[in-house]
Every structure is written in structure tokens, then in C-alpha cells.
Amino acid sequence: MKNLREIVKEKILILDGAMGTEIQKYNLTEEDFRGERFRDLPGMMKGNNDMLNITRPDVISDIYRRYLEAGADIITANTFSCQRISQADYHLENCAREMAFEGARLARIECDKFSTPDKPRFVAGDVGPTNKTCSMSPDVSNPAAREITYDGLFTDVCEQVDGLIEGGADVILIETIFDTLNCKAMIDAALTMMKKHGVELPVMISLTVSDLAGRTLSGQTVDAFLASLSPYPIFSVGMNCAFGAPQMKPFIEHMAQVAPYYISAHPNAGLPNEMGEYDEIAESMAPQIAEFIDEGIVNIIGGCCGTSPEFIAHYARIAEGKKPHQVVEKPKYMWLSGLDLLQVDDSVHLPVDASRFVNVGERCNVAGSRKFLRLINEKNYEEAIGIARKQVADGAAVVDVNMDDGLLDAKAEMVNFLNMIAAEPDIAKVPVMIDSSKWDVIVAGLKCCQGKCIVNSISLKEGEEVFLSHARDVLRYGAAVVVMCFDEVGQATTFERRIEIAERAYHLLVDKLGMNPFDIIFDPNVLAIATGMEEHDNYAVEFIRATEWIHQNLPGAHVSGGVSNLSFSFRGNTYIREAIHCVFLHHAQQVGMDFGIVNAKARMDYNKIPEEQLHLIEDVVLNRRKGAADELIELAAEIKAQADAAKAAAKAGGVAPKKPAAPEWRKESVEERLKYALRKGITDFLQQDIDEALAKYPHAVNVIEGPLMDGMNLVGELFGKGEMFLPQVVKTARTMKSAVSILQPHIEAEKQGGATTAGKILMATVKGDVHDIGKNIVCVVMSCNNYEIIDLGVMVPAEQIVQKAIDEKVDAIGLSGLITPSLEEMVHVAREMQKAGLRIPIMVGGATTSELHVALKIAPEYDGPVIWVKDASLNAGICARFLNEAECPKFEAELKERYEKLRQNYHEEQAKIASLSEARKNKLELF
């Protein structure tokens, strides 16, 4: 019987459809989910679909069977949340592996019943993304904090995949990925468990993007995501959830053009309507799926939320006999990534150079920058982050980070700094070069980055065994690598030794480990010239010769170097050093040097160096004549003396140093400046601008209610349009919090014994729903706006919400939910609040919620105000209106009028729509 790798080349494979919405059709009770075994377990179990593998295997097997009857080639095991971290919400951590095993085992049994030599059926062990993220902080005041780490997630998924393989999975499907670092940990776990079991299963990867702009929740573009995965042995990539077929298609088309893998797509049954339901039916969805198939952009097609066996039966018929997508070749260039893609090839266009050369920012290095070391020692991370931000603004396409100092905990500082810059989109957009002489520091750094990093560095200094071990880690964590020309004998200083070590290392990496040669960057050692020792004078020439040889003889490999080492003899003379670097790079780039660790801001223009100076510097760099180094030393002394004299004259004349010009946005009104600062996450001028605003507005709170909330509302609009993404919104929230902290003493001083906060808000994800990322963002934004937040977490029963609201005397309640069943639970919460005599405002939010659902289902059950909140940034402004005694009645009246119109329009539209049975009666009879 053919295996999956063989069949995928011959035909389009049919993946099954939704599991969750199919389970809902069985109308299972809490008792069904619990079974006898979990009868006394605390909390609510309904909604934990994975436990049905144990308590109602008949239901799960029946769903598998119906998809197989519909023609599915691949059955996705009901194991989406079989990780300890996911099952912790149900107190079932210790059953996670058992659930995974049973889910795969049940699928194996059904697939074996249907398999034939002509149509074998396969089990995909399903690994969902969890509801936690490795890349983002849950605490706005501490961007370095993480709710889960790479190692913790890796351990959980190892246990899950172990159960899946033992249960009979043929393939591992890692799906609905919203954070690439989560995905990398899951791939690592899958490959580790395969090695344990002695199997090589295909690994399918399916991401989901958060908006039509095409970024994941953690901020990566699709191209950056593909770059992050490029070092791994992936079987297929694709997309699921979030979109219906028409919205997903452009992304799948792009993947098919650039990704060297089989392509999968399993879209939702359209987009949820305002009632949280999916309007597409199998007949209407089929033509949309036919476009994917007929245009040859997929190898695997299936369904996600809202699809059913009926959908899959249609897809199977459409795909019959159609040619699958032809996989494109692996790219012949290097892919690196932060939040965005950096493609290093002959057409790369960078901010400083329109050439192939990649500037690697050198200033975030405690060994090379006294200022950066001081800031890290002082724990002044905000200013240290500013150094990284400035390098990127000045043209660095990669940022080197090094924390190697005898008085620092290098590992802790590396992790902390990388986590912090991950929260800075202006920095995180570029890849990171993790630089350390300590291997544990490098590994710890790799576990913090969702993008494809560069490791700096490995070498043969400790022999081949250590070299290969380190290289395997580079592959394991999905990075590119700098290889130093250093071996057991020592550092290479001649051309011959440089190319000998480079060639040996290249063949070990490419031939023995199978590393992509485009992911290898050689550093042939940039060493100081003009030191007074004749044997050093040819170091630059030898480097340039070695660069040319590597470029010509080691296909795909790149060349880098620490450029500032070259001019070490001239330290203290910035002009000469920059001129030497410029000349050296001019010649090295021409023969293949494509990376350089430099101060991007200090890049000098080769064509603007005075001719006499240029000839002299080239004589030194290229070692063209004896005595040139001594002449350059004399020139350097003259230039330094002139510079010192100019400084002294300026000081004596009272001439102040020229200040840099203020940015254009600083010329706007204080309101516009505050809005801009919020949108861009700039805190540098907050104190100055808030002081100006306080002089203009009668009360400190007016500054929050006015320009600051205007800025937050603008961010909300941009986020809704896909013009801002989540890391930017979180950065805005941090800036808002800083602004509020500046205003807080003024607010307190103006109070007359009143409350110390803007209001007390209770937040909860409703019973049956474990998703809390959106709720957490709301909590962050609200707390930044001076609201006291009581967060009850996830899976919160209505009774607990009501009782806590009464006990804490809260001013408003925020209800969150991601899945469709949460909509009905929100209605239940409103009923319980009505019974308890509460009339405080209810705010409703989450992916499946809508204003229409609030108007039709929730508001009629509750006499207090209920409002749908489109996104996190709007909550604070809405609360401010609700809690303002003068504004609240007017706001409630507006809501009632709007809801009445919505209900009226809805009922009118429904009256126009015939039922399916009526439509069939009214069909046109042609024969």
C-alpha cells in the first residue's frame, strides 16, 4: 500500500472537516463529557472536546466514520488540545497523553476499516496552538514576561506527540498557528518523538492570520513565517481557520509560488455571520474550493470551522482526477526573518545600500559598546532598547546582541533583552544575530525568537564533535549560522589557512548534516592592520582573497566580518576608522562579502573621501606599498589635532553643539503629538507633552478622556483595518500606561476623597471557553486607562460572575468568548444578572460576537445596558461614557434606538428569505 509521500505526488488529497461544530450536533450534556470516570471532577467539562476520546468514543468514531464515507483521505484526530497546558483549564493535565493516544487510536481503527490499496486512509495527529503564546507578554508593564516558555511547551507537546505516534498517527498536523515560536517548539517536539519511536512521519504546518493584511497574531507576515520554517524538514504548509475560501485564496496562491513544500488549505465555511453562525453550505462552497483545485495551487484540501461531511463529499468529487500542485524548488538564496522577511540575494535592497550587502548593527554588544554595557548593568533597558531601535532606523538589517561580560549573567540578560525587543515592532521586524562565546547563552536566545536568527558563532576550535553538536542545535532551533575560520590549531591568519578551514567546515555542514548552504556565513577573521608589525599589514588583503575564494568555491555560502576590528590601531580617531572601513568594504563587497557587523549610522560614502586620503587609505588596506601605514598614522594625528582645535575654539567662543533637528511631528499641536506618540509607541516626549496638556485642560482626567483616548480610538480603527498588528497595539498600550502614570499624581491631587480609579471592571471568559488572549489584551488596555481590573480568567460560570460582581461592587462587566457556544453562554450570564437585580453595564467582545447578536439575543434579557465592543482599544472609551453620570442616560438611549433598528431590519430580511423546503417547492419545473 502506498504511503502519504507517494500518493501526494499523484493526486489531490482530501482532508476532513470541522470536529467542534460536528460534536455540537450531538447535543451532548455535561454528563456526556464527564462520563462515569470524571463525574466528581471540579469545574465544567462541557466544551473540552478532547476528553470525549475517553468518555464518548462512540461519538468521535462516528464523526471519523462519516468523514471517511464522504471520501476523506486524511482523518484529523480529535486531539487539538491534548497538551497539559491546555488541559490544565479542566484539571485534566494528567490525562493529556491518554486523550492524544485514544484520539489517534480511534481514528486508526476507522481508517483501517476504510483503507484499500487504491485508496489508503491516513491519520493526522492534530496538535493545536494552545491558548498561550511564547512570543508575547501577558503583562503590559513587563514586556519580558512570558506565560509559557519554549521548554515548557516543548515538554507538553512531546508528551502529546508520543501518544499520537503510539496511537497510530501517520502524519503530525500542527495547525491554527498564531505564534511561530510556539510552532517551532512543536516541530522540535514532533521530530524529537519521531526519533524516539524510530519513525519519520510527515509534518504538516498550517497557520492562521489575524487579518486580511496577512500577519499572524504575533505579528509575522506569511513570508517571514515561511522563512522561520525554512530550516525544518516540513512536508506541507498551508492555512486554516480565520477565513473563508475567497479571503484565504490570495495567501494560498502566494504560498504556492514561493514555498518549497506541498500546499494545504482548509478554510472555514465562509466567515461567521453576526449571529456567530456559518452561512456557507456545501453546494455554495464547492465552486470556491474548485478554484483552488483547478488553478493547481493545492495538494491537500479540507475544511475548518462550520464544514461537515457534506462539504468534504463535494470537495472529494471536485478533486477526483485533478492534478495536484507542483512544488516549487527551494530558493537559491538566504531567508532570514523577524516580523518581516529579509531575503539575501542579488536583488536585496536595504535602507543604506542598494546592494547585496547586509548591515549587521554592532551597538547592542556589551563587549563592543561601553554605553550599552553601562545601560545593561544599570538595568536601564528602555535606553538600551533605544540603541537597537536607532540602529534599525539607521539602516541595520540585522541586530547583533551580545551579553558576554564577566560581571553579567549573560544567559539571563540575553533572554530578557530578546524578549523585550520582541515587544518593539520597529526592532522586531528585523532578524537577530545571537552572539556569544557561551553555547548555553546562544541556545537560550534561540528559544526566544520566532523569526529565523543568525547564530554567531560556531567553529572547529574544539574539534569536529563539538562543532557538529553545535551545528545540530542550529538546525534544531531553525537558524542560520556564522562559522569562524578557527580550528584545533588556532585562528586562521593567512589566506591558505582561512580557505582550508572554510572548506572543511562547509563539507561537514552540507554533506554530513544536510544544512542548507545558503544558511552558512563564513567569518574569515577581520584582523587589525597598521599595527606596526609587518606581518599584520596583509591581513585585509588575505581576508578579501579568502572572501573571493569562498564565493567562487563554496556554493551558496555567505561571508561576514566584524569590520571595526580592522581599524583597531586607530581607536580614538573616528574619521580615519570610518574611512578605513569604507575602503575595506568597497573592495570586499566586490568579491562576495555580503554581511558586515558595522555601525550602520557611520557608513561613509566611498566616493566622497578626498582623493589623496583615499589613495593613502587604499595603500594601507590593500598593502600596496611600504611606509603607507606610517603615513596614515601621521594623517590620523593631524586630523585628530584639527578636530580637537575646532572643539576648543567652539567652546571658547561659546558656540553650543548643534542640536539635531526636531522630527516633523513635534511641530503639531499637543493633541496631535500625544496621538502620534500613542500610535507609534514613543515615550521620549510624554512628560513634556503632558505638562503642556495639563496647562491647557482644566483637569488631568480631561487629558485622558481627550487626546489620549482619541489616540487609542485611532489605534483601534487602524487595527480593525489591518493597518496595525497586535505587537504594535500592545506597545501603544504600554505607552498609554506610561502617560497615565504621569497623570496619576495630578488626578489624585484633584480628588476630593473619591475613588482612586476610573472604575472597577470585572473581566471573564465565559463558561465553556478557554480562550483568553483577547481578554488579556482588554485587561491590559483598561488598566492602562486607570481602571481597576478583576480578571476571573477562563471557563467562568455565570453564577461566579454574578456573585463576584455583587461582592466587589463592580462598575461594569466584560464578557469574552471566541467560540460559537460562548454566544449562548453570554445570554445565560445576562439572564442571571437580571435575576440577581444587577443593572450595571455589560461589555461583550470576542471573535464570534457581533452587535446584531447583542441586539437580538442578549440585550432583550437584561434591563441594564449591553454593548458590543469591536476591539480592545475601544473598551476604555465606552466605559468612560457608561460611568459618566451625565453621559450614561444619553448613551443608553442611543443603544436602545440602534438595537431596535437592528432587530427590525433583521426580521424584515428574514421574512424575505424562503426556507429550504419552500425554495424546493418553488423551483422551476423544466420537464
Language-model region placement:
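Domain-level signal for soluble alpha/beta catalytic cores
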Residues: 1-927
